[in-house]
């Protein structure tokens, strides 16, 4: 005769074990920002782009913004492609000749975010990258938009 209580216990143990294994296999280890190889990560995550007028990558280890500038960018339509990893969001404030022209954000989950920007006239183009969710790694490039 079957002992239902031991059969139920065994079935419950199998279900708990299966759920734990599924949960562990679905988890991804968090990125260790301090040890991250940013150039290797950037090569994997951000598609190569010819004709970039501005690009940068690096680590945000605190909440201080990182600013990169290109001195003489012609006016026109551009595409800003961004990625970050480490959790939270990274913010990209785009300015042309000292005037903010766009704000963009990327979710720091290893996916790409793309926005179109319009540069009003020839002059310096800068991007201030920041996050309240530091530490994280980021990469971006600005290329002329396809016609």
Predicted regions and their residues:
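Transition segment at domain starts
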Residues: 28-70, 145
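Surface-exposed loop/edge segments in extracytoplasmic proteins
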Residues: 52-56, 98-105
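Short, surface-exposed binding/anchoring microloops in extracellular/periplasmic proteins
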Residues: 61-86
């Amino acid at each position: 005769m079957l002992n239902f209580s031991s059969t139920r216990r065994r079935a419950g143990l199998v279900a708990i074990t299966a759920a734990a294994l599924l949960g562990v296999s679905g988890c991804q280890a968090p990125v260790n920002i301090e040890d991250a190889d940013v150039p290797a990560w950037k090569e994997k995550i951000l598609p190569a782009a010819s004709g970039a007028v501005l690009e940068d990558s690096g680590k945000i280890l605190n909440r201080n913004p990182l600013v990169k500038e290109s001195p003489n960018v012609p006016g026109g339509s551009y595409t800003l492609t961004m990625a970050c990893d480490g959790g939270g969001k990274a913010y990209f404030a785009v300015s042309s000749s000292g005037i903010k022209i766009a704000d963009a954000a990327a979710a720091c989950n290893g996916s790409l975010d793309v926005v179109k920007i319009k540069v009003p006239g020839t002059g310096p183009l800068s991007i201030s990258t920041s996050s309240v969710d530091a530490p994280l790694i980021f990469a971006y490039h600005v290329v002329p938009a396809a016609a």
